Swiss-Prot record:
Organism of origin: Eremothecium gossypii (strain ATCC 10895 / CBS 109.51 / FGSC 9923 / NRRL Y-1056) (Yeast)
Stated role: Is required for the uptake of Fe(3+) ions. May participate in the transport of electrons from cytoplasm to an extracellular substrate (Fe(3+) ion) via FAD and heme intermediates. Involved in iron homeostasis.
Keyword Isomerase on entry: no
Taxonomy, superkingdom: Eukaryota
Protein name: Probable ferric reductase transmembrane component
Top EC class for this record: oxidoreductase
């Protein structure tokens, strides 16, 4: 083998081999940039096309369902397909057209260097690619980076083995060769700190190693590579400098007010005027960090700005920016000075800012067929162009900040919307009192568990077309997790029963279930019977406002005063709930603690559930419902049209949104994919 290496080295000096190495680098650069800059935006755009949606819906909801659950799970593994894509692309660029081991070794290093511009392009915030949110590019960035590290490692290992077996280790003293070792060390450190266990527990270490290692690897690869990679280096440095310039130019200092909400949530407020880039769409996000007290610390923060992303819970028209923050390691200092960057737009495909008509122009604005186009609505600052008829949102924990602005905007623009919020503690409901909004469609699920917020999840039940015919399927109960089934399959509905209160025994029973769920029997009520919910399932606070006499005529008495409408009476008054005293087992101390009664203000229109939500066929049928032609107590006018053409056309105007913990977002994505629905996620996962 050593002789073959030596003969190959002699042959590799030829011009033909050098051209092959250069060609593989240019091909890798073109393919990677083409995939990122062209294929990704085109795919995102084509998903919005009605014909493409019809084909994808038929493939996901009808064809794939015939091949069993294992086949569907295999298709839904985005991580697997991304890994295969980049491994096949990198391997093909390094191997195809050459059988010489030395040429292949050199091409491995060349391809790794050629992939770096595309790797850095995927990290730009915000992404310059149309129809693309930069958060959605992070999985692709991770796997492309792993392929780069793998190819660089194989390249270095083969050359090191050759130097060792041929007695030429002295060549490692050359600047170009030991700079290659420096580049490899930077790659390995980046890969090691990028492991989930390190990245989540030691994020600061991960960030600093990632930031420093990026610059070290770019410079070391430039010195090491032969033939030179000047073009790659120019692209890499340009992308990194652009990202630094964009961040610094949109960074400002603000004073933050911290409002405690519960043991797990806090509300941060600062003036909108302090943002350099004002938000245009709801549910954008900003990146924020506590300003260092010393000048050297501030300089360091500008060089290596580690900022935390938070979704803006307020509307773009509000004068105050509000952030709902989970209490963790992020420093919360009332009236403290913070650096804030942004805002970054959410890039939700069905929503766009209205285009103002130019003075003197008679061209009408494009009207959405799903919205009321009254002059008063179009003149409102809350009016947006919305190409959706129904929106189902699922959020967990502090990600309610993503759902609240959308809930208000969609309700205002006449879009049917449901917002499912999964939280751990009912005290988190205090956050609703900080927002004056239309909460119609908000459903809250209190799990009552002691898990971390990132462990919040949602269950989903597999379904088929037979469930729309009312067939009872007792096997569905076995598909639910223990936490879902023990709460009687609390699937959200649009027509559940109501109650005015809950006694102390039932609430205490719920709390006990939360802490001993593993010892309970799995019981599940059939999904078709959920519309007749019993009184232990749901609290619908709209029942406090009786409508029995709403159609009666109003006959004012003589000298009676008409009600005066003020700005405080625009929204319906909230209801107050006094939870009973219940016991909670403290895992840290090992003792049972007792909470005191506390009055909580619950806005009207909110539905409160105890347990873990389950996305089921009933939610899918809600997505199929049409507009009601008038008020109805039975909702019989809102029936789904199961005809194939109308069925797909209706679903093309339905969107499913998810935000929050990764497990919750992934479960919602799979449910939406099985149903062939549009899906958008907002997850700041690391």
């Amino acid at each position: 083998m050593g002789g073959a290496w030596q003969e190959a080295v002699v042959r590799s000096i030829g011009a033909a081999d050098e051209r092959m190495v250069r060609l593989s680098g240019w091909a890798s650069l073109a393919l990677a940039l083409g995939l990122v800059c062209v294929v990704v935006p085109v795919v995102n755009y084509m998903r919005l096309n009605p014909w493409v949606f019809r084909v994808m819906h038929h493939w996901r909801h009808h064809v794939m369902r015939r091949h069993g659950a294992m086949c569907r799970k295999l298709v839904q593994q985005r991580t697997l397909w991304l890994a295969l894509l980049w491994c096949m692309l990198g391997g093909a660029c390094a191997v195809v057209g050459s059988a010489d081991v030395v040429v292949v070794t050199k091409r491995l290093g060349r391809v790794a260097a050629a992939f770096m511009p595309a790797l850095f392009l995927l990290t730009l915030r915000p992404s310059p690619l149309p129809y693309t949110l930069y958060l959605s590019l992070l999985p692709m960035h991770k796997w492309l980076g792993r392929v780069v590290v793998l190819q660089a490692t194989v390249h270095s290992a083969l050359y090191t083995w050759y130097f060792a077996t041929s007695g030429k280790m002295a060549k490692m003293k050359k600047t170009a060769n030991w700079m290659g070792a420096v580049a490899l060390l930077a790659f390995v450190l980046i890969a090691a700190t990028s492991l989930p266990a390190v990245r989540r527990r030691r994020f600061r270490t991960f960030y600093y190693v990632h930031y420093v290692g990026t610059w070290v690897s770019v410079l070391a690869v430039h010195v090491h590579s032969r033939p030179p990679v000047t073009t790659y280096t120019v692209l890499n440095v340009a992308l990194l400098l652009y990202q630094a310039w964009y961040r610094i130019s949109r960074m400002s200092t603000t004073t933050v007010t911290v409002v405690p909400i519960s043991t797990s949530l806090a509300l941060l407020e600062f003036p909108l005027a302090d943002l350099v880039e004002k938000p245009q769409l709801p549910s954008g996000h900003v990146r924020i960090n506590l300003r260092a007290p010393s000048i050297l610390g501030r300089v360091f923060q500008h060089i290596m700005p580690m900022q935390h992303p938070f979704t803006v819970a307020s509307l773009p028209t509000d004068t105050t920016v509000r952030l709902i923050v989970r209490k963790s390691r992020f420093p919360l200092v009332n009236n403290g000075k913070y650096y804030v960057t942004g805002a970054f737009e959410p890039k939700v495909d069905f929503l766009s800012h209205r285009k103002r008509r130019m003075p003197g122009s008679w061209a009408p604005e494009p009207a959405s067929p799903f919205q009321c186009q009254s002059p008063s609505l179009q003149s409102s600052p809350l009016h947006y162009n919305i190409k959706a008829s129904r929106v189902l949102m699922v959020v967990g924990g502090s990600a309610i900040s993503f759902g609240l602005p959308f809930l208000r905007i969609l309700n205002f623009n006449g879009v049917n919307v449901r917002l499912i919020w999964v939280c751990r503690d009912y005290h988190d409901l205090r956050i609703l009192s900080q927002f004056r909004s239309n909460f119609n469609g908000l459903e809250i699920y209190v799990t009552g568990t002691n898990c971390e917020e990132q462990d919040l999840n949602i269950d989903y039940v597999d379904y088929d077309e037979r469930s729309s015919e009312g067939e009872r399927d007792p096997e569905r109960c076995a598909l639910l997790s223990p936490k879902a089934s023990e709460y009687n399959c609390l699937t959200p509905t649009t027509g559940g029963s109501t109650l005015s209160g809950r006694d102390a025994h039932n609430y205490s029973t719920f709390q006990n279930r939360c802490h001993s769920c593993k010892h309970l029997d799995r019981g599940c009520r059939d999904l078709e019977d959920h519309a007749i919910a019993d009184i232990n399932d749901e609290i619908d606070f709209t029942d406090f406002f009786s409508t029995r006499h709403s159609t009666s005529k109003y006959h004012p008495k003589e000298n009676s005063k008409l009600p005066v409408i003020t700005k405080d009476s625009v929204f319906r008054k909230p209801n107050y709930v006094v939870p009973p005293v219940f016991d909670r087992y403290d895992l840290k101390t090992g003792f049972t603690t007792y909470t005191t009664r506390e009055k909580l203000s619950i806005p009207t229109g909110v539905k409160l559930f105890f347990g873990r939500p389950v996305l089921s066929p009933r939610d899918y049928h809600w997505c199929l419902q049409k507009e009601c032609i008038g008020p109805s107590e039975t909702n019989e006018c809102c029936r789904a049209d199961i005809a194939n053409s109308t069925h797909v056309d209706d679903l093309a105007r339905v969107w499913v949104l998810a935000a929050g913990p990764q497990a919750l977002v992934e479960a919602t994505r799979i449910w939406a994919s099985d149903g062939g629905l549009h899906f958008h996620e907002e997850s700041f996962k690391v």
